[in-house]
């Protein structure tokens, strides 16, 4: 990348510059060629800087030249994981340009190229347009994408955190999480807060809200694998009627996926019923 495009406040030890590549000017063909030629540089940097890991998360911006070329390093990424005897996979998180950005035919072509490359790999796509609509009017234009990225990072970290917690009701453990993350093709992740857990059609409301408010592109198909994590407070946990509603909600969401993992957690300060939903193996 060019010097001006390097991220601010990032320690040099966390940055690897590809030799003789002063930007690729939105040219995916050139970007892939450069990355393949320097795959050993990237692989060596991963091994020396990260050491032994189980999972490798690759973040790439769709539409640009460098980000849209990222999958050219997939072989190097997997070779690195194999060399450290990792138990996980390479997982991609890519952005999809906004509607205005897609008016640029080069950006649209590059984004589609990346999406095509990723279609059979485990990945999440973040829809910039959808995120902008959710946040528009709430934050200024300078804070739009930083806020969206932080919200997504928080959602993902909360999912990981719940997978490490024990539950006296129903647990979603790290092995369940790994099973979901290893599923090839696209994954959708979304969350919602429902104040009244006794609302009719709770399952439908959870499903629709999580898909609608997800930063990922909407899906209309069933998934191969999924997870529904529910966080309730102590009062809800003691209510037998709510227990029936939760069971029905889990069954409803389970009808949209071939395999569903679920977890129910009691947190004293929960603002209501907090639901986090994963849908993996999506083909659209």
Task: Give short role names for the model-derived ranges.
Residues 1-284:
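Tubulin/FtsZ superfamily GTPase core signature
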